[in-house]
Amino acid sequence: MSSMTDHTFKILVTGPFAAGKTSLIQAVSQSPVVTTEVATTGDEASVKANTTVAMDFGTFELDGVDDGEDTIHLLMFGTPGQDRFRFMTDILKADVDVVTFVVNAEAPESFAEAREMLALVMHDLKVPLVVAVNRCDSHEQARAIADGLGALPSVAVIPCQLVDPASGREVVAEVLVALLQSTELALTSQGGFR
């Protein structure tokens, strides 16, 4: 008789202002989403009414893994996108297992900032990266945007429409694949499966 195993992974959901980070977490979370949204002020108020100032938090569970005995828990931590709250990203990225970087394909004016953010987030992390290109239906366009942000060719890139929960689940599927691949690589390098 096998015993039930619990696998919990921390996912950092980050990216520029109004990219769709909160939308992703709200679309896929199986628990009530904890948000720290307040009314947006200044020029940004014309883009969206509310903005995250500390973090968003949601969970996703996948039961029945490995002959029904294991459960995978994803703990999703969303960062603020505004520069003045950027320090929260450094706090939230501690002990992260995967970074999901969300960028809005319809906001090319944010790409330079997104490139800088991505470099800052990943510079000291050795974890998988998934780039979710929101408001995009084309794999080619999504790949071109991710390349422009400095993502390596090996990075998973997914076009998505994060107002649609099904699209959010596709992003989660990419996160799970990235976790599986990184776990397999780690086990192989430690003499695990071959």
Question: PLM features: residue spans?
Answer:
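Conserved G1/Walker A P-loop phosphate-binding module
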Residues: 1-49, 61-63
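Switch I (G2) and immediately adjacent beta-strands of P-loop GTPase domains
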Residues: 40-84
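Conserved catalytic network of the ASCE P-loop NTPase/AAA+ motor domain
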Residues: 52-53, 61-69, 90-95, 121-126
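Conserved beta-strand segments of the P-loop GTPase G domain that flank and frequently precede/overlap
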Residues: 76-78, 100-105, 130-134, 159-161
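Inter-motif core of Ras-like GTPase G domains
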Residues: 84-107, 122-124
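Conserved C-terminal guanine-recognition region of P-loop GTPase G domains, centered on the G4
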Residues: 103-153
